[in-house]
UniProtKB/Swiss-Prot annotation:
Organism: Escherichia coli (strain K12)
Family statement: Belongs to the helicase family.
GO terms under biological process: defense response to virus; response to ionizing radiation
Cystines in this chain: none
Miscellaneous field: Part of prophage CP4-57.
Occurrences of domain Helicase ATP-binding (ranges): 109-271
Protein's UniProt name: Anti-bacteriophage protein B
PROSITE patterns: HELICASE_ATP_BIND_1, HELICASE_CTER
Keyword annotations: Antiviral defense, ATP-binding, Helicase, Hydrolase, Nucleotide-binding, Stress response
Annotated PANTHER family: ATP-DEPENDENT RNA AND DNA HELICASE, ATP-DEPENDENT RNA HELICASE SUPV3L1, MITOCHONDRIAL-RELATED
InterPro entries for this protein: DEAD/DEAH_box_helicase_dom (IPR011545), Helicase_ATP-bd (IPR014001), Helicase_C-like (IPR001650), P-loop_NTPase (IPR027417), RNA-DNA_Helicase (IPR050699)
SMART domains (alphabetical): DEXDc (SM00487), HELICc (SM00490)
Annotated ranges, domain Helicase C-terminal: 297-472
Length: 729
């Protein structure tokens, strides 16, 4: 059957092409379940070359029907028979008269509609989100939880659902929101699922990218049991299984999932290769570190590919290097627009992101401020940027429309990517209804098959290596006898409190013990630097830095800040806390970076700025508030033991780190795409309520549009309007 497929595929480009023979081969492949996917692939390729099938349009249409690609039946053909129209009516989605299911979507929708638990493993292009929207469109489900891997994807999902179902459902996506409706959809990361206590009586929960439930296998063959995001996702799964009537797990192609059945949750596992686009893959086999050969190959690809192209790179630094090389080779399009000027002013004109954007090339990476991520993706999808250079953010569900994908590196940071992740990146090429055939260019060899295409869920497969902080926070019903025994053994001596581990599940038991030991060894003078309730005590930052260096050193070291000695770390902490604003801190850091570079440091300004953006978002905004919350509880305990009666409350310091120097709550607007710099200008202009949630803040900005539209710049206004969904008159 493969031979029939290859011959037909090859013939499509030939001069003596016979459309009848091609469609005859398609029919043969579609008639055999073993070769059905190959037949469907040929149909997609035929639609990409419609002009070659003008003599046999009816046969082509019938083959489209036979392949189950009903959306193409609706979109690509005008002369539809009554029977064709009946098929389209049968496969029409409940949320839109204009959207039609393909056969696999309909199958999954039918399983879920009948109340079954479903685990779906399918390619990126299959259209998994349309199934969720259709379930909502039926109107029979009242409360749903959608668990997504990133805040960026939560925001993208929120926008889609708000537009389609905002009149019927309250869309909850931020910790500040209170549920006030009988009909609600929670769109949250796993950490936010675990923070909320109002997630009860759920009709259906969905976990997107369910493979993230499994601990990663390292190159050495060992399993990384310390990934706190995997732990948090398993805790969320346990919580949701307990309060939900049904679940739907989705992700890219894997072979099997293990662990759910041991927990007593029957489910239907569907693994399908149902693609709505065809993919052509070319491999170059260049060595990993041979940048010269890679850049040469990339130049050839850029010359040959005129359509929208995503280039996957292992890091923002490499993405910046590649962008500058594309510009040097003449593949940039010099652009002058207000957004480029805004970025130059607010960040720096020499920053890789600014230089790329000025030349019609987009950069997209995790530490990039949300508003710039959204703007870049919007411009790319609108066809205004030919190239989009991404890091692993491409895997996290950024919604893009690209004809071509170039995989420049087979790594994510310093980690090698496996065939599983490689395939996930490839799935970003092509787009149903836009690009029939996607082209993939792999500059290195394709990774070999590995066992990572099986997903083992730690919650269901509990062993000697299952982290105690995971076990402490899951539902008691989900603990195995073996885990209960381990659990009792760890907590028998009361050195570490169970309640503390449950409350701070981000941290491993060894980290709790480490912190306890540090406090026990502190003299009164050092310990007193931790006892305060508003303004940090003298020498607090010195002691805090010492604790960070022991507990979570990577939060600084992976972002270019040495943790030993702690002087540089203390300077960063002090610089951030004492700055008047986010902008002031960034500008100061850029000035320092320029000074280092002039003194011969090998780091570039872009590396320094990208590291600081990561520090602000990941370290200051996320990790350090968690460390402070844990410290506060442990300090209170030790203060009592030491006979200290003073009040201990770190709320003010935590807010200083996580709020970007904005009033309480206002930073929530950054998540929906309003830059922090713009928010500072709005704070100077308007009176924000301290008690308002993100919905109320958004409404307040809509109500005050007459004020801010006269007082702040054009680009700031564009960001606000995009975030709030305000269309210009």
């Amino acid at each position: 059957m493969t031979e029939i497929y290859e011959q037909a595929k090859h013939s499509l480009q030939g001069e003596d092409f016979s459309s009848f023979n091609y469609l005859f081969a398609v029919n043969k492949l579609l008639s055999n379940p073993v070769s059905y996917d190959l037949g469907r692939d040929l149909i997609v390729r035929a639609l990409d070359s419609r002009e070659r099938f003008s003599e046999h349009t009816t046969i082509l249409k019938n083959m489209v029907r036979k392949s189950g690609l009903f959306p193409y039946l609706k979109k690509e053909f005008t002369s539809l028979t009554p029977d064709d129209l009946r098929v389209l009516e049968l496969y029409r989605t409940p949320f839109s008269d204009g959207y039609v299911f393909h056969s696999m979507q309909f199958h999954i929708f039918d399983l879920l509609k009948s109340g079954q638990n479903v685990v779906l493993s399918a390619p990126t292009s299959m259209g998994k989100s349309a199934i969720v929207d259709s379930l909502l469109g039926m109107g029979t489900l009242k409360r749903l939880v959608l668990v997504v891997p990133t805040v960026a994807l939560a925001d993208e999902t929120r926008r889609r659902l708000q537009e389609r179902f905002g009149d019927r459902y309250q869309i909850i996506h931020h910790s500040s929101q209170v549920c006030h409706s009988d009909q609600a959809v929670y769109v949250l990361t796993q950490e936010r699922v675990n923070e909320r206590d109002d997630i009860v009586d759920i009709d259906l929960f969905v976990i997107d990218e369910f493979y993230k439930l499994a601990f990663r296998q390292l190159k050495s063959g060992d399993i990384d049991h310390q990934d706190e995001r995997v732990i948090e996702l398993n805790i969320a799964l346990s919580k949701l299984l307990k309060v939900s009537r049904q679940f739907y797990l989705t992700g890219p192609f894997v072979n099997s999932i293990r662990g759910l059945e041991k927990l007593g949750y029957p489910h239907t596992f569907v693994s399908t290769d149902f693609n709505t686009v065809a993919l052509d893959v070319k491999t170059f086999g260049i060595k990993a570190n041979d940048d010269k050969a890679k850049l040469k190959a990339l130049g050839e690809i850029a010359h040959a590919c005129v359509d929208a192209t995503i280039i996957y790179c292992k890091s923002p630094t490499v993405a910046g290097l590649v962008a500058r090389e594309l510009i040097r080779l003449g593949h940039g399009t010099p652009t002058e627009n207000p957004h480029v000027d805004w970025v130059s002013e607010e960040f720096d004109a020499d920053w890789d992101y600014t230089v790329a954007l000025r030349n019609g090339i987009g950069l997209h990476f995790g530490a990039l401020p949300r508003a710039l991520q959204q703007y870049t993706a919007d411009q790319f999808n609108a066809g205004k940027l030919r190239f989009l250079l991404c890091t692993s953010t491409i895997i996290e569900g950024v919604n893009t429309i690209a004809k071509n994908v170039v995989i420049y590196d087979n790594r994510d940071g310093t980690r090698s990517i496996d065939k599983f992740t490689h395939g996930n990146i490839k799935g970003r090429a092509g787009r149903m209804g836009v690009h029939f055939v996607g082209k993939i260019f792999c500059l290195e060899e394709i990774p070999e098959d590995n066992l990572n295409q099986e997903v083992d869920i730690p919650l269901g497969i509990q062993g000697i290596d299952t982290p105690i902080n995971l076990l402490a926070s899951v539902q008691p019903d989900h603990l195995s006898e073996f885990s209960q025994d381990r659990f009792d053994e760890v907590f028998i001596n009361d050195r570490v409190s169970i309640d503390l581990v449950k409350k701070h599940s981000y941290f491993r038991v060894e980290q709790f013990e480490m912190l306890q030991s540090m406090f026990e060894m502190m003299d009164d003078n050092e310990f007193s630097s931790l006892v305060f309730h508003w303004t940090p005590a003298t020498n607090f930052l010195k002691t805090f830095a010492k604790i960070i260096a022991r507990l979570v050193p990577h939060t600084f070291s992976r972002n270019g800040v040495p943790v030993k000695p702690t002087d540089v770390m203390i300077a960063k902490l002090a610089g951030y806390l004492s700055a008047e604003s986010y902008s002031e801190y960034l500008k100061n850091q850029i000035d320092y970076a320029r000074q280092w570079i002039s003194e011969g440091e090998k780091r570039t300004l872009s590396i320094a700025l990208n590291n600081d953006l990561k520090l602000i978002t990941n370290t200051f905004g996320y990790t350090l508030p968690k460390v402070l919350s844990l410290m506060e509880d442990v300090v209170k305990h030790h203060a009592v033991k030491r006979g200290i009666r003073s009040k201990v409350d770190y709320t003010h310091v935590k807010l200083a780190f996580e709020s970007f120097h904005l009033p309480p709550g206002v930073n929530a607007l950054e998540e929906i795409g309003i830059p922090i710099q713009t928010l500072h200008r709005l704070v100077d202009l308007l009176e924000f309520s301290d008690e308002a949630d993100v919905d109320e803040l958004s409404q307040y900005l809509r109500d005050t549009q007459d004020i801010w539209s006269r007082s702040i710049g054009y680009v700031d206004q564009m960001f606000i309007r995009r975030a709030l969904g305000i269309r210009r008159h």
